[in-house]
Regions:
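Short aromatic-glycine-(Arg/Gly/Cys) micro-motifs in beta-strand/loop hairpins
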Residues: 1-22
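A short, structured loop/turn motif at beta-sheet edges
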Residues: 1-4, 30-34
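A structural detector for beta-sheet-dominated domains
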Residues: 7-9, 31, 55-57
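Generic "edge-of-domain/loop-turn" microfeature
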Residues: 13-15, 33-35, 59
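A short, exposed loop/beta-hairpin motif centered on an aromatic-Gly-Thr core
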Residues: 20-32
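Low-complexity, intrinsically disordered Gly/Pro/Thr-rich segments
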Residues: 35-43
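Short, mixed-charge low-complexity intrinsically disordered segments
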Residues: 45-59
Length: 59
């Protein structure tokens, strides 16, 4: 298993109905980069984020 640093850009809709953007860094442990991105993307979709862009590097 390897650790990946994933830079994430997403949009989401607030309770007031406006669309906001956010940028953050997550650390994910996975077998490979594709799995790391898949795990994080699934988590973010479940949380209601849209327009998910992920850039990963191995750390």
């Amino acid at each position: 298993m390897k650790e990946y640093e994933i830079h994430t850009t997403v949009t989401y809709t607030t309770d007031g109905g406006t669309t906001e953007g956010s940028y953050f860094v997550e650390y994910v442990t996975a077998k490979n980069m594709a799995e790391a991105k898949h795990l994080l993307r699934s988590e973010l979709k479940t949380a209601g984020y849209k327009n998910i862009r992920l850039d990963a590097i191995e750390v």
